[in-house]
Amino acid sequence: MKKFKVAVLANLKVNAPKFEGMFEDQWDDLDSEKTVNEMVEAIRSGGHDCEFMEGNLTLVEKLPKYKADICFNICEGYYGDSREAQVPALLEMLRIPYTGSRVLALALALDKPMTKRILHWHSLPT
């Protein structure tokens, strides 16, 4: 069996930015250190090299240096309307394969009015 270099990409709750006026549940969709550590250990137990990387701007420098064969992406992102699509966009620019939905699917899913227009165009109920 081929040994892969896998990068687990996630946004940890503990590292999430805090700002005045944020909702109490602002970062409920982010991951715990326990979850990410268990994922990394599960991949390593399969005989693969695996490293966790926080899904933020540091990826721009870290990913090319690590030379991952594939990224296990569970990033939610921190900023912007299409925050969930940001890391996949970076991975596509770097030409690194990744798990999960592609950029367009994520961006559309987060843009409810555009999603409704597309569904309406195809005569699908919303």
Region annotations inferred by a language model:
Residues 1-99, 103-104, 108-110, 114, ...:
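ATP-binding N-terminal substructure of ATP-dependent carboxylate-amine bond-forming enzymes
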